[in-house]
């Protein structure tokens, strides 16, 4: 067997070995989503459950559902004037979901709103995600790698301020 054929065979074996891990992770996300959806049947205006399910759908790459639940979170948060909680996290989720769908204007608008709320309230935990999203936007949409790095370092600094060791070490 030639070296290239051996390499291809090795790659196939490795990829097949990863399938159970990917499948298991997907199953965990689906289970977590189902738990939140069941909870929302009883408590449809629970902001924490809406936040969790919207981000779970975002992690699952089901951007339409992330947007659906992110909008609900926004409406409830806005009506309750929960800007530094429900509203900021809805903007983060909506911004990232719209970016992944290619809706760059909406993505930038939501991330910009989240940034304003986060910076005015010194919400470093949320700013980690905001700066990450803005950095991805700068890199992938604007092709402005300097700005992307600036956001990356702002995110690292925000992570340091809120003691997210895993994010800045």
Regions found by a protein language model. Give the residues of each.
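Bacterial N-terminal signal peptides
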Residues: 10-19
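Sec/Tat signal peptide C-region and signal peptidase I cleavage site
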Residues: 21-25
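Bacterial N-terminal signal peptides that target proteins for export
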Residues: 1-11
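A "functional boundary" signal
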Residues: 26-169
């Amino acid at each position: 067997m030639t070296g290239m054929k051996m390499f291809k065979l090795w790659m196939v074996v490795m990829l097949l070995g990863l399938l159970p891990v990917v499948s298991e992770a997907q199953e965990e996300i689906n289970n977590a989503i189902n738990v939140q959806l069941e909870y929302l049947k009883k408590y449809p205006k629970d902001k924490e459950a809406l936040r969790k399910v919207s981000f779970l759908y975002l992690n699952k790459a089901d951007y339409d559902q992330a947007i659906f639940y992110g909008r609900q979170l926004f409406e409830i948060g806005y009506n309750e004037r929960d800007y530094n909680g429900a509203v900021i996290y809805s903007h983060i989720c909506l911004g990232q979901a719209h970016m992944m769908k290619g809706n760059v204007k909406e993505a930038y608008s939501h991330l910009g709103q989240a940034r304003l709320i986060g910076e005015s309230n010194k919400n470093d935990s949320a700013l980690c995600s905001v700066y990450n999203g803005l950095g991805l936007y700068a890199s992938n949409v604007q092709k402005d790698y300097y700005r992307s790095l600036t956001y990356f370092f702002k995110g690292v600094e925000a992570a340091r301020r809120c003691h997210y060791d895993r994010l800045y070490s």
